Amino acid sequence: MTEQNGQENESNKTLALNLSGRPDVAGALKAGVRVIPVEIEDQMKEAYLDYAMSVIVGRALPDVRDGLKPVHRRVLHAMNERAWRSDRPYVKSAKIVGEVIGNYHPHGDSAVYETMVRMAQTFSMRETLIDGQGNFGSVDGDNAAAYRYTEARLTKLAEELLKDIEKNTVSFSPNFDDTRQQPDVLPANFPNILVNGSTGIAVGMATNIPPHNLKEAVNAVIALIQNPDITLPELMKILPGPDFPTGGTIIGGEGLYQAYATGKGSIRIRSKVDIIENNKGREIIVIHEIPYQVNKKNMLEKIGDLVNEKIIEGISEILDLSDRKGIRVEIHVKKDANAQVILNQLFKLTQLQVSYGITMLAILDNRPKIFSLKEILKSYAEHRREVVVKRTEFDLDKAQKRAHILEGLRIALENIDEVIRIIRASKDVREAQSSLMATFSLSELQADAILEMRLQRLTSLEVQKIIDELEQVRILIADLEDILSKPDRVKSIICDELGKVSQSFGNTRTTEISLESLESSTFNAEDLIADEEVVVQLSEDMFIKRLPMDTFRRQKRGGKGVQGISTKREDFVKKLSSAMTHDNLMLFSNKGRAFLLKVYELPIATKEARGKSLKAVINLNDDEIITSLFTFRNFDESYLLMVTREGFVKKIQLDEFTNTKKSGIIAIGLRDGDELIDVIANPNNYDVFIGSKNGLAIRMNLNELRSQGRTASGVTAMKLEDDDSIAGITKVEPNTNLFCISENGFGKRTDFEEFSTKGRGGKGMTYLKIGEKNGRAVGISSVKEEDELLVITQSGMAIRVEVKTISMVGRSAMGVKVVNTKDEDFVKDFAVVRESDSDSAES
């Protein structure tokens, strides 16, 4: 001890030397005050940890047993203490707030009132614990009225949380000023931690436990009690997922399973929406339910902003028709807009669909812990076991005390004359008490009960009542002792009581659970873009764009057309193709490279606009141009046919290009001086028809060609004269005819039967008579009677005509005028518009 004091004195001397600038400390040392030097880092660490644990345990996180934070528990206990229950009149909220602050929660009144308000909001709590009267806020984020205006009382369900609290079922601790006792936890006759969930941010941790359906939560507890080895999949058949007060649809089965298995996971909550038609045939998106904790007003304002900023197009009007009966928001869709696409955009860009992270963090034994679903159920079941046991012990003690009194009264009544004699002979109460105890071997309590007994109890009827009551109490005692000796009876009582709560207060599930995965609920670009028919247009200077198909109105054969592209003086239309916006667009260059992108990735432009430079979209080299393009929906095992300017043809499977990117890959190995001219898809192995610009063609069977790899250069299709080159390639489909068009706008249809199938390598036969009047062939394609043609000239004029208006003539004919070309203008390309199969459109 002397050695220790010596060390402290030495320490104080050192401290005095180091604190010459602190006269207060130096003075304390001189006065003999004990000063203990500490490291500031250690002190800050200890103080912060103390504060953190105070926040974690005493403020921000719920107790796993009753699902309540301290402030919620204090509010409910204060209201119960003052008997402000469901069978009593409403009480001013100000009075409740004052009671809680004055006796249990010495903090700001706003914190207490906000707690009250939340427990009364039907859109915040799955099962409200406070019955509020007045304005308690709204799903639009409106604040509740001041507490001087509102009134409240406990709900019947809240009373189930407090039931049996007077029977020593839970522990109590002193309040802040040691004037009252407050419960450390409530008896909780239902699993409130699951039913109403909890949200809170502590120091370094946070909890977000979703609410659940009361019936399902109760059934899950019962199932666990009856089968402690129950598996999580079995539990999830009973309790499939959260049940939010605002309804909606839960998406993310994997995330939900993960949350229940580990205590942490993520789901998505989607609004419940219908798409209906009004009397005018216009589509309306009707929102009935929104995700949990979403502010409806803010959500609608966000939608309005997206519409005003033209991020979402196609919405004409937004109406909020919500009332006391529920939510109803109508989003009116414009005539030509796609309601499903708009809805997908709303899901992606607004809180019509939200991500909800689950962290089931709660307090157990004064320590924070992340619970799995099964652990929560076990903790609650153990809590209820303790409550039932303590309640039974309390009732047993009370019954035993009552039996003890009744036994004394029975003895007195059986010896009433002697009792009266003893009492009359006694000088005072104490002597009478002692005499009775000595004569009949009674306890002090029994003697006092006899002395306090009224004379009316001496009637024969009252005597029998005492005897009957004693018998009933003895039966009760035996039953209570049996409960305490048999754990199975305790389990049975817990299950029975839970079942009664479920039967009295349970209701149907409001939130649907979708089997979609989280990945399937995320929206890719295609979900947000309408799958519409468009025209893909490419100019000589490699500017590309897409236009709505209805940009080009139908005209009679021989019309002048409409302006289809605004070009510079030296820029002209090169290629044209019809497509759907969700199609894949494969581009092939003269150098034999292939590029892949989606049609919707092309810029939308007007008829007059040039579009976007293709070099800004794909990786084209300076000496490289696109000579062919075609669209298709999906990669499959069908074949592509490629034809070069010098008459070589190559067959290759489409799925060889699945890894094609915008950077490009080799599609064909070209011979010196040759270029790739055209590419088509031939999924059904039809005969192939290849035509030259000088009007010669060859028809061959596809089986003559073997499939080759991407780097192969192909084989000879037809022998060409020096001044000739390939105009195009098409497939001979059933119920189709050959269509060809020449530079000066003459076109015709010819029956494929006029062309016999021959082997490759020949010079070909005439399919179009060419001359100065009609010019050389521009391109060929197979067409059906119901198809339409979109023809465009070098200057950008476009005409859309029906195939059936074009005459069927022989293979040596020149054809009829399809489009009237002006001086120095000529047909550059055409596209087939086929409603039934846009994928097969060729140019």
UniProtKB/Swiss-Prot annotation:
GO terms for cellular component: chromosome; cytoplasm; DNA topoisomerase type II (double strand cut, ATP-hydrolyzing) complex. The keyword Transport does not apply. Transmembrane segments: none annotated. Coiled coil: none annotated. This is DNA gyrase subunit A. It comes from Leptospira biflexa serovar Patoc (strain Patoc 1 / Ames). CDD domains: TOP4c. Its main location: cytoplasm. The active site is at 149 (o-(5'-phospho-dna)-tyrosine intermediate). Its EC number is 5.6.2.2. GO terms for biological process: DNA topological change; DNA-templated DNA replication. Belongs to the type II topoisomerase GyrA/ParC subunit family. InterPro entries: GyrA (IPR005743), GyrA/parC_rep (IPR006691), Gyrase/topoIV_suA_C (IPR035516), Topo_IIA-like_dom_sf (IPR013760), Topo_IIA_A/C_ab (IPR013758), Topo_IIA_A_a_sf (IPR013757), Topo_IIA_dom_A (IPR002205), Type_II_DNA_Topoisomerases (IPR050220).
